[in-house]
Amino acid sequence: GLAMAWAVLGPLLWGCALALQGGMLYPRESQSRERKELDGLWSFRADFSDNRRRGFEEQWYRRPLRESGPTLDMPVPSSFNDISQDWRLRHFVGWVWYEREVILPERWTQDLSTRVVLRIGSAHAYAIVWVNGVHTLEHEGGYLPFEADISNLVQVGPLSSHVRITIAINNTLTSTTLPPGTIQYLTDISKYPKGYFIQNTYFDFFNYAGLQRSVLLYTTPTAYIDDITVTTGVEHDTGLVNYQISVKGSNLFELEVRLLDAENKLVANGTGIQGQLKVPGARLWWPYLMHERPAYLYSLEVRLTAQTSLGPVSDFYTLPVGIRTVAVTESQFLINGKPFYFHGVNKHEDADIRGKGFDWPLLVKDFNLLRWLGANAFRTSHYPYAEEVLQMCDRYGIVVIDECPGVGLALPQFFNNVSLQNHMRVMEEVVRRDKNHPAVVMWSVANEPASHLESAGYYLKMVITHTKALDPSRPVTFVTNSNYAADKGAPYVDVICLNSYYSWYHDYGHLELIQRQLTTQFENWYKTYQKPIIQSEYGAETIVGFHQDPPLMFTEEYQKSLLEQYHVVLDQKRRKYVVGELIWNFADFMTEQSPTRVLGNKKGVFTRQRQPKSAAFLLRERYWKIANETRYPHSIAKSQCLENSPFT
């Protein structure tokens, strides 16, 4: 029934799903573009009314927020949950209101050949934006950017330099959001007040919300470079850079494209909206610890000259480009034709006080820890991370499995037509934003969905097929914890990603069973699918400072012993068809409260404050040993980051 209905709908969905208008280039400054950051303190107010609709009924967006009632100072970027001492805000579900007043430079408001854009890095989960009380933009889904041209609202007269931006954000998760959730009304009035409800989620991290990434204004000319798509290839020692450029605001234009190397020397140039640049003797983009000069980046400089009704304009945009190839065989993952082994981590965007708020000191610390560990990869579990994170990966050579917020797809009712269409749109937004990052080598469309369900099989097939159509240049996967014989989505992936928690959630305490159970799992999956396998999660909850020998659960010794048991099997299988291992997790992180979570998930090899547990040293020794093996050229580990290696 369900599959049949979908089979009929399939072509319709397909036709309307490629619906995204325009590009989402990262806002960079250039000769023709300016940025004005709106990070800092915003006015904030949560709507605590029973129906959460008071802000709309009283039209809080029509005048300054402080006139509607008491407001708080709220830092942006940050989650709002951990900032105040109000327990209601910590657990709030519903609409919150943010507001910021800014003064624009006159050249933005008076020069009609300037286009002014408001960009929001992310707002979790549904956002409505007003500028000077005028409804401007709505966006569904956290973790991804959205923007609006607000020129006609700010170029309207002598007082137009004063701009008031109001953003209402709702963090409620329903059966059609990504991630999904359910709202449960508790009606037993002997226990609960009237109208009492809770938000149920089906994933293991705290549902932080707010303006968690930067908000900014930027300008372009009225005719502008709207999007650039780059794919790269290698023929012998010549690098190939294929580009496609879209221009908006003019039909009369010329494009010049220049490719510069890291020393700013011109290595190739071209013209027009698409073409191929050839780079003889190209320096390839290699992962960290795979080459003595990893992460080599070129710059693609695009120059637009266009005719508009107001006369000629020019626009400039520079895109970092890494020349590299990715391929998958039945037992290997190849980067630039060489076998690549993922030795890395799963992460979360999570820290004390700021929650999921973007933070430069934290980001740089995390990258220093990744390099210290000898990690060459991570997965963006379980949502796309901030754009600045991926830019760091490009620069440091850290390989990324880029995951969308398809987590917690645990119930049959979550696999419906509306969700499917929403999921496909989200994949379009992810690919549109992240397609040009050389560090991104694979898309992940979901984490631990209920993939044994018939409806899930069709759903995953549609999302994966759609993602491959959006970007044929990268493999696509989802991360499974289903049984190999029951998984309905696995036939459609390029790489099998397996989560398993032997002797933690299953046969807990029995470390002696891990080798047998893990070996059986790998062999069953490989026999069935003949595809490379990544151990995409494994680990143990560890309270720092708990010690016991022989090892007991929750101690540092147990985490180490569990890892060692996994590593015995991983060492046997990585010589065959296992192409990676990602520990769960890089650092401890916050979850919903439950009797099994002691102030969050404690499976990190670092604490939430980024200090090492015993297992971090074990993992570091292993990752550097793998990196130092003979299959990488010998000079590498010596010349690269000597201070990081435990063996120097």
UniProtKB/Swiss-Prot annotation:
GO terms for biological process: carbohydrate metabolic process; glucuronoside catabolic process. Its EC number is 3.2.1.31. The active site is at E448. It is found in: Lysosome. It holds the Pfam family Glyco_hydro_2. Keywords: Glycoprotein, Glycosidase, Hydrolase, Lysosome, Signal. It comes from the Eukaryota. Glycans are attached at N170, N269, N417, N628. Gene3D superfamilies: Galactose-binding domain-like, Glycosidases, Immunoglobulins. GO terms for cellular component: extracellular space; lysosome. It catalyses: a beta-D-glucuronoside + H2O = D-glucuronate + an alcohol. Inhibited by L-aspartic acid. The keyword Signal applies. Residues 1-19 form the signal peptide. Its main location: other. GO terms for molecular function: beta-glucuronidase activity; carbohydrate binding; signaling receptor binding. Plays an important role in the degradation of dermatan and keratan sulfates. Homotetramer. Belongs to the glycosyl hydrolase 2 family. This is Beta-glucuronidase. It comes from Chlorocebus aethiops.
